Amino acid sequence: TQNSWELKFYALKPFYRSLANWAIFMTNPATYGWKDNVGTMPPIKVHIHDVPLTHEQRLAAQTATGNLITVSMGGIGDRGKLSQIAKGKDGMPTNKPGYIRDLIASWPSESTLVWCKYNQEQETMESVLEGCASIHGTTPEEARYALIDDFKQQRRMQLVTKPKILGYGLNLQVATRQVFSGICDSFELYHQAVKRSNRVGSTRELNVHIPVTELETPFIDNVLRKADRVQQDTEAQESMFKEIGYDFVG
């Protein structure tokens, strides 16, 4: 492919055979007969929720794309426009914040991470989730520590932020629910955000809720398709290394 490498099917085994001389691909030691430290990790359950568009959103989408219905994501510019319309850009009426508020209210005793994409979207979620913690890119470091501690100690039951801000490294197992108010095409951002609450040592299943309008369906379909592909590739690569069976398997 243009400006990138492509691994042909017939070259898979020779490639991994060469790689296995000095490397190993591993997500679970049990694959190679070693102690399984991750087998007891609870499952991640993903729930997709359909949120109806408002009349104003539908008209705005038709104006932006020239189509009566959304049939594809289009280019980056079109995707960005549709994503902002779906989230109620510039005060446009939207059903999503109220839907998310009511959804979270249905599990009052569970801590929830709410992931946003845009600043305005995050501010809207702050306004409908009374008493929530909210961390922006401009939030001072000391304030971040205090808000995260409030969330971990369940003094605040919801934490609103963005994957680019808190999606990496943090251990937030206290959250047994996650809600993606906004989502983009990046599987890495989605995966890292989800794994903040599903880590070695977790004892409770994680429920991930993704409320989407028809404008956002292509985004989530794309991300989940990437997730399936990553899982398939992971299993195939581990199987290949195991089949090759150099000394590291012994």
Question: Model-derived features: where do they sit?
Answer:
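Short, well-ordered beta-strand core segments
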Residues: 159, 178-179, 197
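A conserved SF2-helicase RecA2
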Residues: 185-250
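Hydrophobic residues at beta-strand termini and immediately following loops
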Residues: 49-51, 135-137, 181, 211
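A short beta-strand element within the Helicase C-terminal
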Residues: 170-183, 207-209
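Interdomain linker/hinge connecting the two RecA-like lobes of the SF2 helicase core
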Residues: 1-111, 116-119, 125, 221, ...
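Conserved beta-strand segments of the P-loop GTPase G domain that flank and frequently precede/overlap
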Residues: 115, 161-162, 180-183, 211-212
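Alpha-helical elements of the RecA-like P-loop NTPase motor core of helicases
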Residues: 59, 98, 123, 127, ...
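Conserved helicase ATPase core of P-loop NTP-dependent helicases/translocases
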Residues: 113-115, 123-126, 130-166
